[in-house]
Amino acid sequence: ATSASRTQRSTKLSHAPFQLPNYSNTFSGVCLVNFFNLWYNTKKEWRRTMKHTALITGASRGIGAALACRFAAEGYHLALCCHNSYETLQALATKLETTCSIQVLCFRGDVGDYTFICDMVQKTLDTFGQIDVLINNAGISYIGLLTDMDITDWNQIVATNLTSVFSTCRQVIPSMVHAKSGHIINISSVWGNVGASCEVAYSACKGGINSLTRALGKELAPSNIQVNAIACGVIDTDMNRCFSEEERSALIEEIPAGRMGSPEEVASLAYSLATASSYLNGQILTLDGGWI
């Protein structure tokens, strides 16, 4: 054969498609096909039934309870905590387990206590294997002049509102980094953006949460973890029911939307953040009806 014909033959051989032997009519081939189909269908069913997990602090009432209801309705297993109103939290958990076919863990403790946070996160991971969404919602307020505060009041507000966010993030992040996936949503306030007279400590904590959110979003973005915050305006919760009807009416008049926000609206936005594009990161989303 000439050199040209050898080259032509070689070219044809190199482009011939590779074909697997046909084992479909053999016993081993049938077993292999059946095994593959079983594996594929089992994996498909496992993916269909696999639920995500959300850990929500301050979940017994108000925004926290609305968050729990929304994520439960979307099929999330839940880990919920509160400091007071534990019976209310348990009743909520029972209701959600029954109506949404999910599992709920309830914890009672002070989110300002680092040991409590460590135990809660570990038990949640032991039970569910992962925490897909962390929502830092727990918070307390102090209304009064700064000069009337003592150091105990200040430390308690900072521990509950700000240090707790560090604590939960510190404990949850390693598992999210390992999974290369996760959402951290911090419930903040417009007072963190502009400050409020007679709520200095609360404003300082919320401002700290906003800065933490922006910085941590940058830090965790390479690990495909999104960190965002919701800066709430006036939401109709127990925290704002200290106002008289006259004060509430005057406050509502200042809000372009003409009403207070609802806890369910906060929960809806939080769920949107938990399912948003990974490119949305380190942002503070204001939910205030156009108020600030």
Residue ranges and their predicted role:
Residues S60-R61:
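Conserved glycine-rich cofactor-binding loop
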Residues C169, C205, T213:
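Active-site helix of classical SDR
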Residues P174, K218-P222:
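Alpha-helical segment proximal to the catalytic Tyr-Lys
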Residues S189:
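Residue(s) in the substrate-gating loop at a strand-loop-helix junction
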